[in-house]
Regions:
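Short glycine-/small-residue motifs
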Residues: 125
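Vicinal oxygen chelate
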Residues: 1-8, 32-79, 89-116, 129-144
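Conserved active-site tyrosine of GNAT-family acetyltransferases
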Residues: 21-26, 92, 120
């Protein structure tokens, strides 16, 4: 692994409406709130837990009403791995979260579906399937 980096620890979102964002990520997706911090400038920061070692940081007071479109230079999307895409889709639908891009087999050989958060940020859910391109690439790199 390059420079001994072992994982992505968190991603951060600057949002215009903290309550609306927490209702989506905490209440609908089920990411528990871990802690709240107040920065030196008085700004609040909320940490939500994705896994034991991965988090999303929510920074309120964002300007604008929507994430950049797909063609804009910026972070394009976040992908969250799930063990069962159909169960995830059922959960999303039960929470009233519209499926933006329906389930399909991606070019990498994995199942995926997409949603948008309340600010338009794109979220991909991916179920890794046996024999996927990532698995093949890891095997190739491990053998060289």
């Amino acid at each position: 692994m390059a420079h001994n980096i072992s994982a992505i620890a968190h991603w951060a979102l600057k949002v215009p409406d903290l309550d609306r964002t927490l209702a989506f990520y905490r209440d609908k997706l089920g990411f528990p709130e871990m802690l709240r911090l107040t920065l030196d400038n008085g700004q609040l920061l909320v940490y939500l837990r994705i896994t034991d070692t991965q988090f999303v940081e929510i920074f309120p007071n964002g300007k604008g009403n929507e994430a950049p479109d797909e063609a804009t230079t910026a972070v394009n999307h976040i992908c969250l791995q799930v063990p069962d895409i159909d169960k995830m889709i059922a959960h999303l639908e039960a929470q009233g979260i519209p499926i933006w891009r329906p389930k399909k087999l991606g070019l990498d050989g994995n199942l995926q579906c997409w949603v948008r958060d309340p600010d338009g940020n794109r979220i991909e859910f991916m179920q890794m399937l046996p024999g996927n391109m990532q698995e093949k690439a890891i095997a190739r790199l491990s053998s060289s």
